[in-house]
């Protein structure tokens, strides 16, 4: 939108209501992308007010006086994220300001921002008002910045309320979506990128992909059936895995499961208690499983890849990662600590129960 129009609109909107009778006027509509000012005559019908210092949120924002509490600012995390998360009022103020001045918190001038070559046009809009999440990666994985290879910036599907977030989508991620095992078609790719429906939207997206050396075959059969994973970009799927790991670590009922397994084993006459109490072999088995899981990290947006010497294992893990958009790779490690704790806990509980006198065992079972 024209910068002069923003400036004119800002100077004509009064900061305080006028006391006393006022002639009825036609209300004006704020200049946004969807609706511009209806006419210059409508803007001129605003009542005049005495000159005074403008203490509106917009003025404070432009003068650098806005506080962290007023705007609900979050600390910046890089040059792509100079615009912090703001309240709805502050977001509207930024839109009116046209992002003419540097952000008062990060001291970075938006006019100097240059997206990577061939990045889509909606990247600036998404980055300006919403923080881009880069570090939502579970422990045990090495971070890799996706900025230099960014193809697009997409709003998260799982954001709630005003806590809107964005995620980077890299060129290689788009290549993974279009190749095996999913081979997504143009419609599914547009769903993945949350692209709006346009008359020639498919053509524009295919042209953008061609600029990055990715050819989209028309009328190709999609291998993946429509599912909920298709709608998630890899960075958001990894973020979901991080939150799942936190929930499992904090709330999974390990002790309750240990008690239940131990008592069921004692009640089963055919149960091999010696095998269940052999926690040494169980620990070695779980340790070997963890070693395999951590030896391979297929390419995922925001995570440093790590191949193993077993090419067959690498290919299998990469296929699984592509089919699950990275969620399967990060979530498979979530359960290992809990399952290891359950196995060792069952062995300890069985030893404790079997050491009691024989006549007291039925009482233990009843409990």
Curated annotation (Swiss-Prot):
Signal peptide: none annotated. It comes from Caenorhabditis elegans. This is Transcription factor aptf-2. Belongs to the AP-2 family. Sequence-specific DNA-binding protein that interacts with enhancer elements to regulate transcription of selected genes. Required for neuroblast and epidermal morphogenesis, perhaps acting in cooperation with transcription factor aptf-4. Residues 29-49 are annotated as: Disordered. Keywords: Cytoplasm, Developmental protein, DNA-binding, Nucleus, Transcription, Transcription regulation. The gene is aptf-2. PANTHER family: TRANSCRIPTION FACTOR AP-2, TRANSCRIPTION FACTOR APTF-2. InterPro entries: TF_AP2, TF_AP2_C. It is found in: Nucleus; Cytoplasm. The keyword DNA-binding applies.
């Amino acid at each position: 939108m024209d910068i002069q129009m923003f400036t004119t609109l800002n100077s004509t909107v009064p900061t305080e209501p006028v006391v006393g009778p006022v002639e009825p006027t036609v209300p004006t509509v704020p200049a946004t992308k969807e609706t511009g000012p209806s006419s210059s005559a409508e803007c001129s019908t605003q009542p005049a007010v005495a000159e005074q210092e403008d203490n509106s949120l917009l003025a404070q924002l432009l003068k650098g006086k806005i506080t962290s509490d007023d705007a609900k600012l979050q600390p910046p995390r890089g040059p792509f994220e100079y615009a912090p998360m703001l309240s709805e009022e502050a977001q509207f103020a930024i839109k009116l300001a046209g992002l003419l001045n540097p952000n008062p918190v990060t001291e970075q001038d938006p006019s100097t921002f240059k997206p990577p070559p061939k990045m889509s046009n909606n990247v600036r809009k998404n980055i300006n008002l919403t923080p881009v999440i880069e570090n939502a990666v579970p422990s045990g994985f090495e971070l890799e910045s996706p900025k230099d290879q960014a193809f697009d910036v997409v709003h998260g599907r799982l954001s709630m309320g005003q806590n809107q977030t964005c995620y980077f989508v890299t060129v290689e991620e788009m290549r993974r979506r279009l190749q095996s095992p999913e081979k997504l078609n143009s419609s599914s790719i547009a769903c993945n990128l949350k692209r709006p429906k346009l008359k020639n939207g498919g053509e524009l997206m295919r042209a953008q992909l061609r600029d990055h050396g990715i050819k989209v075959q028309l009328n190709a059969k999609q291998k993946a059936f429509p599912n909920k994973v298709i709608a998630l970009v890899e960075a958001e799927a990894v973020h979901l895995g991080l939150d799942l790991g936190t929930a499992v670590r904090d709330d999974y009922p390990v002790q309750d499961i240990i008690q239940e397994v131990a008592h069921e084993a004692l009640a089963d006459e055919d149960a091999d208690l010696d095998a269940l109490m052999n926690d040494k072999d169980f620990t070695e088995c779980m340790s070997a499983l963890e070693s395999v899981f951590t030896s391979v990290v297929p390419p995922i947006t925001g995570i440093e890849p790590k191949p193993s010497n077993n090419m067959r294992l690498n290919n299998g893990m990469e296929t699984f990662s592509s089919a699950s958009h990275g969620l399967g790779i990060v979530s498979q490690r979530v359960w290992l600590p809990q399952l290891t704790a359950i196995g060792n806990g069952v062995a300890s509980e069985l030893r404790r129960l079997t050491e009691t006198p024989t006549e007291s065992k039925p009482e233990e079972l009843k409990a």
